[in-house]
Design a protein with these regions (language model features):
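Bacterial Sec-dependent N-terminal signal peptides
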Residues: 1-26
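Basic, amphipathic N-terminal segments that precede the first structured/catalytic domain
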Residues: 25-46, 50, 76, 80-84
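Loop/turn elements at helix/coil->beta-strand transitions in domains of secreted/extracellular proteins
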Residues: 50-52, 100-104, 149-152, 178-182
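Short beta-strand element of the alpha/beta-hydrolase
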Residues: 51-59
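Active-site catalytic motif of lipid deacylating hydrolases and related acyltransferases
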Residues: 58-151, 273-290, 296-316
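Surface cap/lid and interfacial helix-loop subdomains adjacent to catalytic sites
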Residues: 132-149, 170-309, 313-315
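Gly/Ala-rich beta-loop-alpha elbow adjacent to hydrolase catalytic centers
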Residues: 157-161, 165
Length: 316
C-alpha cells in the first residue's frame, strides 16, 4: 500500500509538472513602451486649442494564436504588424468622428483575445484582462504627463476598451477626475461592484452633465443580453439622452428605446446585418459590433457639448 501511494504521488507530481510546463509555454508579448510614439495613434483636430483631449481604447481584435515555437498566446502583440493593422482599423474610424475639434490619443495595448471572453468564466477573464488593463493604465499615466490639465478630458472605449474605461475611472486620482468631461463605455457593462469600488463612476442623467459615465449596449430584445459583456447596472439612450423608456428615432427609420429594467438599448427597424454573427457569441440578437458607429453622430456632438460645459464651469 505504501509503495502504491508513493507511485500515485509520483504520478500526481508528474502531472503537475506537465501542467506547469503548459502554463510556462504560454507566450506573453513584450510590454509596450508608451514613451515610444509608435505605440500610439494620435490626431490633432483642435487648431484653435479650445477642444478636449480624447483618450480612446480599442476593442478586441485578436483570437488565440501560436508562436513559431508552438507557444499559445492569449494577447495581442503590439509589435506584430497584423495585430497593429487590425487595431488601427477601429482606432482610425473612431478618430474620424472623435478627433475633429479635439486632440485624439489611442494606445496600442496587449488586449486579451476573443477566446478569453468566450470562456464566459469570470476568473479567466479577470486574470487575463489584468495584463491588458495594466497596459492601458500605464498608457493613460503617460498621456496625463504630456497633456495640459486645463483642457477637458474625455475617455472612451468599445467592448474590451469599454472595460478599460471602467478600470481607468477606478485608477484615476481625484485631481484627474476633476478634469473629466465624460467617460463613454460603449458596448460594455458597469456593475454594482464597479460603482461600489469607485466614487468617480456616476451615471449620466442627461445630455450635458459632466464627470459622468455614459454606458450603453444594443440588442434587438432583452433576451439577447450577453451577461459577460452587457449585464449592466446603468444605461442611457444616446439618441435622446433619456434614462427612461421614452423612445427615440434615429436616421428616420430606427427606433431606440432604453429598457429601464435591464439598462440596455432595444432597437427596432434595424437589422444590424452588416455585422456578421461571431461563433454564436456576438451579433446573435445583440448588435454588439454597432456600438461605436450607429450613434457616432450623437456621440460626437455630445462630446463637444459636455466638453464645453466643463470648460465653462472651470472658467476656460
Amino acid at each position: 500500500m505504501e509503495k502504491e501511494n508513493i507511485r500515485l504521488f509520483g504520478l500526481c507530481l508528474a502531472f503537475l509538472t506537465i501542467c506547469n510546463t503548459v502554463v510556462l509555454a504560454q507566450y506573453i508579448p513584450q510590454e509596450p513602451n508608451y514613451a515610444d510614439t509608435t505605440m500610439w495613434i494620435t490626431r490633432d483636430g483642435d487648431a484653435e486649442g479650445t477642444g478636449a483631449d480624447v483618450f480612446y481604447v480599442v476593442s478586441t481584435w485578436e483570437e488565440d494564436w501560436t508562436t513559431e515555437n508552438g507557444s499559445v498566446c492569449h494577447f495581442a502583440d503590439v509589435r506584430n504588424p497584423v495585430h497593429r493593422r487590425h487595431m488601427a482599423i477601429e482606432i482610425n474610424r473612431a478618430a474620424d468622428y472623435m478627433a475633429p475639434g479635439n486632440r485624439f490619443y489611442a494606445p496600442y495595448y496587449r488586449h486579451t483575445t476573443m477566446e478569453t471572453w468566450m470562456t464566459l468564466n469570470k476568473d479567466t477573464i479577470a486574470n487575463r484582462c489584468r495584463l491588458a488593463m495594466g497596459d492601458v493604465c500605464k498608457a493613460f499615466d503617460h498621456f496625463l504627463q504630456q497633456r495640459d490639465p486645463q483642457r477637458p478630458l474625455i475617455i472612451a472605449g468599445f467592448s474590451q476598451g469599454g472595460k478599460a474605461v471602467v478600470e481607468l475611472l477606478k485608477h484615476m486620482k481625484d485631481e484627474t477626475y476633476s478634469q473629466l468631461a465624460a467617460a463613454y463605455v460603449m458596448g460594455y457593462k458597469v456593475t454594482p461592484e464597479d460603482t461600489a469600488a469607485c466614487h468617480n463612476i456616476r451615471p449620466a442623467q442627461g445630455d450635458s452633465d459632466t464627470g459622468v459615465t455614459i454606458c450603453y449596449n444594443t440588442v434587438k430584445d432583452v433576451k439577447y443580453i450577453q451577461p459577460v459583456i452587457a449585464q449592466t447596472c446603468m444605461g442611457i439612450n444616446p439618441v435622446n439622452w433619456r434614462t427612461d423608456a421614452t423612445p427615440a428615432t434615429l436616421h428616420d427609420t430606427i427606433t431606440v428605446t432604453l429598457s429601464p429594467e435591464y439598462h440596455v438599448l432595444v432597437v427596432s427597424g434595424y437589422s444590424g446585418s452588416e455585422y456578421k454573427p461571431y461563433k454564436g457569441f456576438l451579433n446573435v440578437g445583440d448588435i454588439h459590433s454597432c456600438e461605436p458607429w450607429l450613434y457616432s453622430e450623437q456621440i460626437r456632438e455630445n462630446m463637444q457639448l459636455r466638453s464645453r460645459r466643463l470648460a465653462k464651469k472651470r472658467g476656460r
